Design a protein with these regions (language model features):
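Non-catalytic, usually N-terminal nucleic-acid engagement modules in DNA/RNA processing proteins
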Residues: 1-15, 131-134
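Charged/polar positions on well-ordered alpha helices
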Residues: 1-9, 26, 99, 182, ...
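Generic detector of bulky aromatic hydrophobic side chains
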Residues: 2-3, 21, 51, 179-181
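Alpha-helical packing segments of well-folded alpha/beta enzyme cores
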Residues: 3-6, 38, 69, 176, ...
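Surface-exposed helix-capping loop/turn segments at secondary-structure junctions
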Residues: 9-19, 187-193
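Electropositive, surface-exposed helix/loop patches at the edges of structured domains
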Residues: 12-22, 92-93, 142-156
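Glycine-rich phosphate/ribose-binding loops and adjacent secondary-structure elements
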Residues: 17-140
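C-terminal extensions of enzymes
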Residues: 141-193
Length: 194
């Protein structure tokens, strides 16, 4: 409640400047009663005409329960404001989050795994440092239109990782981020098409 009051004061102070949204983060670990209560409390909270502009679903979400936990929260929040799922880990988590009602996501995992030579593909991920890629002059993923796949080969990215060149993780990150964005685009198109 105090943050809403302070946000209202700061918003008035910043009159004429772009509006800065305030989002509430729903916690409660794997406990349904805590998650639902936190979601209801934050959804109903208002102070001086201020209310949260959206909600983040945060905390330690166990992978096998991610969809269930997000659905508890989304059932309590309604659909009048966006629901953001914080810190998902793998691309398949996007599907569970969307199915449970999350609208947006963030994650460092595409770059984190890229720094360790993991490359996302439609069939899962692979480690580009494996010896079989030493002389593989195809793109990281055939048909991918990211900068890395259109300019470099598996063999070259493999070489960069083996040589411990910083460019290796940059190129892998570019690909993994592109892959993740295209996956979200495909999910969005699928929802739009029914």
């Amino acid at each position: 409640r105090r943050c809403l009051v302070e946000h209202g004061r700061l918003t008035r102070e910043r009159a004429g400047k772009p509006y800065q949204q305030l989002w509430g983060v729903i916690q409660g670990a794997q406990w349904e009663d805590l998650r639902r209560r936190a979601a209801r409390t934050m959804a109903d909270m208002e102070a001086d005409g201020q209310r949260f502009d959206g909600f983040g679903v945060g905390g330690a979400l166990e992978k096998e329960n991610l969809g269930t936990i997000v659905s508890w929260v989304c059932e309590e929040l309604g659909e009048d404001r966006p629901r953001h799922l914080l810190g998902i880990s793998e691309p398949e988590d996007l599907f569970a989050g969307v199915a449970a009602g999350a609208d947006t996501f963030d994650c460092v995992n595409p770059s984190r795994v890229a720094r360790n030579a993991a490359i996302y593909t439609p069939d899962g991920r692979f480690n580009i440092t494996n010896a079989r890629f030493k002389r593989d002059f195809t793109p990281l993923v055939e048909g991918c239109e990211c900068y890395t796949c259109t300019h470099y080969t598996r063999a070259y990215v493999h070489h960069l990782f083996k040589a411990k060149e910083i460019l290796s993780s940059t190129l892998a990150t570019i690909h993994n981020e592109w892959f993740t964005l295209r996956l979200v685009d495909a999910i969005r198109a699928s929802i739009k098409d029914g």
